[in-house]
């Protein structure tokens, strides 16, 4: 096989779908989905871009140990692996007091432990090739907190720490790790995940009135969100560069300005802005 080999997890929708199709221009892509038989959108988009022959769709549930073990055995046939894009993720929401502990655990199983387990499984095949890359899809939520999204926010903060350590550990092997930190984009993680996994406060909950205001803000923000193709294009750009010089790559409307504000001003200033926007 002449093409380099890339793995993209969570490739049946959102960033993963678009990234898999874009990467197929230059890579042979192993695109994973929990239910490959339902990845019709990926098949159709790949056909539309004439890259169907460069994409292999396979089963992977990043929360299931046996699924990861089976995936690892299958991937060994493609070694060495040149690129791993850890994109699979979901979003649980709600106020901390209202969110069941099981939701926190499930959130971390997908967004943190799933990434760690897949990375550990694939690393032996990545280390065989100097110049390989690992791209972890994080979020602006991995850099700044937001109310009513604590399970998601805390999982992305954990992913940031894992990725930072991973990058340093793999430098001696010529393997570079990067974090992509999108802001608000039109993907199914918000429309599907939060509608299924949001712990909505009861009418008599102390948080009910605040939930309505925050939900209104999130919905308005969603209407102004960006095109997810921007994120897929950034993944492709980093994947095809000779070197990934930085660890973090924030992307999205107003994100860099937000991070600049956070770095220049004290927490109290940021808190005042959030309080005014969300609770006043």
From Swiss-Prot:
What is the primary gene name for this protein?
A: yusZ
Is DNA damage included in the keywords of this UniProt record? no
Binding residue positions for substrate: 139
Q: Can you name the source organism?
A: Bacillus subtilis (strain 168)
List all disulphide bridges recorded for this chain.
none
Q: Where does NADP(+) bind?
A: 3-29
* GO molecular function, a single term: oxidoreductase activity
Alphabetized, the UniProt keywords read: Oxidoreductase
Q: Which PROSITE patterns match?
A: ADH_SHORT
The family database entries (SUPFAM superfamilies) matched by this protein are listed as: NAD(P)-binding Rossmann-fold domains
Per the record, the similarity remark reads:
Belongs to the short-chain dehydrogenases/reductases (SDR) family.
- The UniProt record lists the keyword ATP-binding: no
Question: According to its UniProt record, which residues of this chain constitute the active site?
Answer: 152 (proton acceptor)
Top-level taxon in the UniProt lineage? Bacteria
- Per its record, how is this protein called by name? Uncharacterized oxidoreductase YusZ
């Amino acid at each position: 096989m002449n093409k380099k080999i890339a793995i993209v997890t969570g490739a049946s929708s959102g960033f993963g779908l678009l990234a898999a199709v874009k990467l197929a221009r230059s890579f042979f892509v192993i695109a994973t989905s929990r239910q490959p038989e339902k990845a019709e959108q990926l098949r159709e988009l790949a056909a539309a871009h004439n890259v169907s022959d460069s994409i292999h769709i396979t089963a992977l549930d990043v929360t299931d140990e046996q699924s990861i073990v089976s995936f690892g055995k299958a991937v060994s046939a493609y070694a060495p692996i040149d690129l791993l894009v850890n994109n699979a993720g979901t979003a649980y929401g709600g106020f901390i007091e209202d969110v069941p502990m099981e939701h926190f655990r499930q959130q971390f199983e997908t967004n943190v432990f799933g990434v760690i387990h897949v990375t550990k499984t694939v690393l032996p095949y990545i280390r065989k090739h100097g110049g390989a890359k690992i791209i972890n899809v994080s979020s602006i939520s991995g850099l700044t907190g937001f109310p009513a999204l604590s399970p998601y926010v805390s999982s992305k903060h954990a992913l940031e720490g894992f990725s930072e350590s991973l990058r340093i550990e793999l430098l001696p092997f010529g393997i570079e790790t990067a974090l992509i930190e999108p802001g608000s984009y039109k993907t199914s993680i918000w429309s599907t995940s939060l509608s299924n996994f949001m712990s909505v406060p009861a009418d008599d909950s102390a948080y009910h009135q605040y939930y309505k205001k925050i939900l209104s803000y999130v919905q308005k923000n969603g209407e102004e969100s960006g095109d997810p193709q921007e994120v897929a294009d950034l993944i492709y750009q980093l994947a095809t560069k000779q070197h990934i010089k930085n660890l973090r790559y924030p992307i999205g409307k107003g994100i860099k300005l937000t991070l600049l504000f956070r770095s220049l001003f004290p927490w109290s200033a940021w808190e005042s802005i959030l309080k005014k926007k969300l609770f006043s």
